[in-house]
Swiss-Prot record:
E.C. code: 4.1.1.72
Necessary cofactors: Mg(2+); thiamine diphosphate
Protein's UniProt keywords contain Lyase: yes
Protein's name in the database: Thiamine metabolism regulatory protein THI3
């Protein structure tokens, strides 16, 4: 007979609410907690060590901790962040806001002053000095799907369960304030023997039936269809349903930049990355001439709509958002898309399909190899690195050139992409890399036979300088990511897009990047500085380099005014937009026109490199 949870952990009849909280996270296989300690959070953190499977990451600052919880959540379904009242939570709020914008489930627990001090409105440290202890809670409410304070002894266990469920199901941050004098509120441990109910709410059967009928009708009639997979496919755990739908329909499949890594890019139906009007010609051709388009996990950001200068030509579109569906001109709110897709799959009859499958053209166009002594360029690097990726890789790309360059790659099967294309907080990926490393460590341990996911980070030198402290935490835990520092001597994307390319605010202080691992006390590492095509080829062809048995930092030396092709394409859209502004206002001087040093680059990249 299987023992109950309380028996396995030999729990007494009553436990503290803080113990209960950590046991609930343990039950969901959430084993790493991120954050920084503080006077108001330390009593809570003491309880963390009562649960054998949990560990405290101990981040370098709260912002990086929020980034790490976000990266962890993208693989595990939920990230937990603990900060102290006021100064700590405000340091983290940028990262939490990013999780809200990008639909990532975070449980943010804030250690608060005792309720007695709050009632008396004492002028405690970490307050604004006005006796208002609710101000930070109010600030958090705008970047959380739910907020609460653990103050009622009769309801506190229900509140803990509610917070975890909301963060898990809605994939948005939840704010939980816990005063220091409430940490030991007694709770019956027997509640832990009943698992959390994480079932999605059932759809209205009549509405669901109508939506399914209309979508299937379009599917059966369509002769030139397309499927576009967007960000919320991974956020709402729709990957398996999407995979089955693509396999059975055999429609042409595309991903948005935020959806990259959610479908099998080695499948013959995969056609590439859809970025609105700046998509590759072969992608535009399919989408523009489609008579029916399904967008799964829809998030209409500027990166998938060419800065909102693109609309689907066909009106026969099924836009499947996180919790609603737009079908032509009709909107159906309050729908679970996961349950809807499952019902569509259950009712799908492939014999009724009108579409005749055809293989999509390869997005990887063979290019002549430059000589080995040729200096590296973005365009060549991003095309070449695809050959080094392996199934199961976690590929993280920073806001900037890397976020555009990765769209030129083709991922192997079961590869996940992590980026922050919508919120775009520069420096996010160092913390996200830490969180992803913790997550894959736990996933590898839980799987049999064991897998060995590699975590690969591409980060510009400017972004690296913003959040470098978390490299110390990576070293502390002996984690083994690949960190590619794309050194183009400053903020090249901004330098390229803005009309003043020579402004000093693009520049940064040069660092000895490869010396930092030694500074942080690392002993198991490898560093490389790659300048030429030959050095790059030699590196990725080395079988030892392919094994993630140590932390590796690779500095890729690039020209300061060199950018990926996808960014050049975006510039064309920006130029047209600026031209329209100029026509509307002849006195306007803020026109994005490339300076002379970019003209040769435009011509060179347009013919390939």
């Amino acid at each position: 007979m299987n023992s109950s949870y309380t028996q396995r952990y030999a729990l007494p009849k009553c436990i503290a609410i803080s113990d209960y909280l950590f046991h609930r996270l343990n039950q969901l296989n959430i084993h790493t907690i991120f954050g920084l300690s503080g006077e108001f959070s330390m009593p809570l953190l003491d309880k963390l060590y009562n649960i054998p499977n949990l560990r405290w990451a101990g981040n370098s600052n709260e912002l990086n901790a929020a980034y790490a919880a976000d990266g962890y959540s993208r693989l595990k379904g939920l990230g937990c962040l603990i900060t102290t009242f006021g100064v700590g939570e405000l340091s983290a709020i940028n990262g939490v806001a990013g999780s809200y914008a990008e639909h990532v489930g975070i449980l943010h627990i804030v250690g608060m002053p005792p309720t007695s001090a709050q009632t008396k409105q004492l002028l405690l440290h970490h307050t604004l000095g006005n006796g208002d202890f609710t101000v930070f809670h109010r600030i958090a409410s705008d970047v959380a799907c739910y907020t609460t304070l653990i103050i009622d002894s009769e309801l506190c266990a229900d509140e803990v369960d509610k917070c975890i469920k909301k963060a898990w199901i809605e994939q948005r941050p939840v704010y939980m304030g816990m005063p220091v004098n409430q940490v030991n509120l007694p709770i019956e441990s027997a509640r832990l023997n009943t698992p959390l109910d994480l079932q999605l709410h059932k759809n209205d059967p009549d509405v669901e039936k109508e939506v399914i009928s209309r979508i299937l009708s379009f599917i059966y009639k369509s002769q030139n269809p397309a499927i576009i997979v967007d960000a919320c496919t991974s956020r709402q755990n729709l990957i398996e349903e999407t995979k089955e739908l693509c396999n059975r329909l055999k429609f042409p499949v595309f991903v948005t930049p935020m959806g990259k890594g959610t479908v099998n890019e080695t499948d013959p139906q995969f056609g590439g990355v859809f970025t609105g009007s700046i998509s590759a010609p072969e992608v535009r051709e399919v989408v523009d001439f489609a008579d029916f388009i399904i967008v799964i996990g829809c998030m209409l950001s500027e990166f998938s709509t060419s800065t909102f200068h693109f609309q689907y030509k066909t009106k026969n579109c099924a836009l499947l958002y996180s919790t609603s569906v737009k079908l032509k001109n009709a909107t159906y709110p309050d729908l679970s898309i996961k349950l809807l897709l499952q019902k569509i799959l259950a009712n799908l009859d492939e014999s009724k399909l009108s579409y005749q499958p055809s293989e999509q053209p390869s997005m990887m166009v063979p290019r002549p190899y430059p000589a080995g002594n040729v200096l590296l360029r973005q365009e060549w690097v991003w095309n070449e690195i695809s050959h080094w990726f392996q199934p199961g890789d976690i590929i993280i790309t920073e806001t900037g050139a890397s976020a555009f360059g990765v769209n030129q790659t083709r991922f192997p099967v079961n590869t996940l992409g992590i980026s922050q294309a919508l919120w775009g907080s520069v420096g996010y990926t160092m913390g996200a890399c830490l969180g992803a490393e913790f997550a894959v460590q736990e996933i590898n341990k839980d799987k049999f036979p064991a897998t060995k996911h590699r975590v690969i980070l591409f980060m510009g030198d400017g972004a690296f300088q913003l959040t470098v402290q978390e490299l110390s935490t990576i070293v502390k835990w002996g984690l083994t990511p690949y960190i590619f520092v794309m050194n183009n001597q400053g903020y090249s994307v901004d330098r390229f897009l803005h009309h003043r390319s020579d402004a000093s605010y693009y520049d940064i202080q040069p660092w000895n990047y490869l010396g930092l691992l030694r500074v942080f006390g690392c002993t198991n590492y490898e560093t490389k500085k790659i300048i030429t095509v030959g050095e790059f080829r030699s590196m990725i062809s080395d079988p030892n380099f392919a094994t993630n048995d140590k932390i590796r930092m690779i500095e890729i030396m690039l020209p300061p005014r060199d950018v990926p092709q996808a960014l050049l394409d975006r510039w064309v859209v920006e130029k047209e937009q600026s031209k329209q502004v100029q026509e509307e206002n002849e006195n306007s001087s803020a026109v994005n026109t490339p300076t002379p040093e970019f003209q040769p680059l435009l011509k060179k990249n347009q013919v390939g490199y």
